[in-house]
Amino acid sequence: MRALSVGVSPTAAVDTTVYTCPRGYYSKFTVMYIHNTGGSTKHITVQWFDASANSTLDILTQYDFTSKNYLQFDGNAYIVLEEGDKLKITTQSASSFSFIATFEEIGLTRQ
């Protein structure tokens, strides 16, 4: 198992891929921090792209954050991403966010 954190400051109103599960691995998506660093209330959408089903599922849909507010997801639950699955975000136009996610990458032989 390899722990990996990924951080991005996405361009506003652009579909941004935060993470793609590499070939030969599956990943546990365990932690997510989202922070509105801008000066006004703006929203963000967080999505999981499931490559095996070729479908996209919303984790958060246009979730509003007031200025300087943040959200933290962590705990005993996680989402399992398989080869080619992606974590993607899209923020509202004229927004400023920071986004950090942590994954545990594990070889395809589940333990």
Tell what function each PLM region has.
Residues 39-62:
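Short, surface-exposed beta-strand/strand-loop-strand elements in extracellular ectodomains
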Residues 11-16, 65-71:
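Solvent-exposed, conformationally flexible loop/turn segments
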Residues 47, 87-88:
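Short conserved beta-strand and strand-loop elements enriched in small hydrophobics
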Residues 23-24, 28, 59, 67, ...:
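A generic structural signal for well-ordered coil/turn residues at beta-strand boundaries
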Residues 69-84:
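Beta-sandwich interaction modules
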Residues 1-37, 83, 90-111:
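C-terminal interaction-tip segments
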Residues 60-63, 76-78, 88:
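Beta-strand-rich interaction surfaces with strong enrichment in secreted/lumenal proteins
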